[in-house]
A protein has these predicted regions:
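N-terminal helical cap/lid subdomain that shapes the substrate entry/recognition surface
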Residues: 2-88, 97
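Well-formed, non-transmembrane alpha-helical positions, independent of function
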Residues: 93, 115-118, 137, 156-159, ...
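Substrate-recognition element of Asp-dependent hydrolases with the DxDx(T/V) motif
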Residues: 25, 87-116, 128
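Acidic, Mg2+-coordinating phosphoryl-transfer loop and its flanking beta/alpha structural elements
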Residues: 105, 145-187
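A short, structured active-site edge motif that brings together acidic residues
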Residues: 40-42, 107, 121-135
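Non-catalytic pre-domain segments flanking phosphatase-related domains
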Residues: 1-8, 194, 198-201
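Short loop-to-alpha-helix "cap/lid" segments that border enzyme active sites
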Residues: 130-141, 151-155
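Structural recognition of alpha->loop->beta junctions
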Residues: 119-128, 178-194
Length: 201
């Protein structure tokens, strides 16, 4: 029997990061004198930071601006971000079942860990991975299920042959998540709790 190993996405899965990300983008826009439609940015969270910044900055500026964003982030974002409904319970359900839970996110690992520390969630973090990069982590860590809010999360699950559990708390609708291959679509993370007993081991 294999061990239950469940990965969780961070932004818009475990946490509502829109207020913190929005505050950081507003500060970045003011500091650089660059227009950034922050409401648009926070409506489509998921892809890596550099991919979003490329919509607003010349390609050669993206690396330095990304570094500045990440430097601003701890003070501006961490205090503004709260757990989404059922997050603590979903993680605890995995642990209570004798499983391992950890975070796999496109976000910078250091800032992701700061969120978890601030919210008193003790989980390991694998950061700066997206789409097929997440699938590689799933394979390497023996993940049996992954909880995410984005179609690319579900595509990573399909690629790595793990159970995909989707929550429509981010930019993707339930229908989009199902079409991307989600095995389960739950309203919020409380729905994950009921799925844990039947997840592969």
């Amino acid at each position: 029997m294999t061990r239950l190993v469940v990965g969780f996405d961070l932004d818009m899965t475990l946490v509502d990061s829109r207020p913190g990300i929005g505050a950081t983008y507003r500060a970045l826009a003011e500091e650089t004198g660059t227009f950034i439609d922050v409401d648009l940015v926070t409506s489509r969270l998921g892809p890596p930071l550099e991919a979003e910044l490329a919509h607003w900055f010349e390609p050669e500026r993206v690396p330095e601006v990304a570094d500045r964003y990440r430097a601003l982030y701890p003070d501006l974002a961490i205090p503004r971000v709260e757990l989404l409904r059922g997050a603590r319970e979903a993680v605890q359900a995995v642990l209570d079942a004798g499983g391992e839970a950890f975070v796999v996110t496109g976000k910078n690992g250091r800032n992701a860990a700061l969120h978890l520390q601030h919210l008193a969630i003790d989980l390991d973090v694998v950061g700066e991975v997206w789409r097929e990069g997440k699938a590689d982590v799933f394979r390497a860590r023996g993940v049996t299920a992954y909880v995410g809010d984005h179609v690319h999360d579900m595509e990573a699950c399909r690629s790595a042959d793990v159970v995909g559990i989707a929550v429509p708390t981010g930019p993707c609708s339930p229908d989009e998540l199902r079409a991307a291959g989600a095995d389960h679509v739950v309203d919020d993370l409380h729905g994950v709790v009921g799925l844990v007993p039947d997840l592969p081991r």
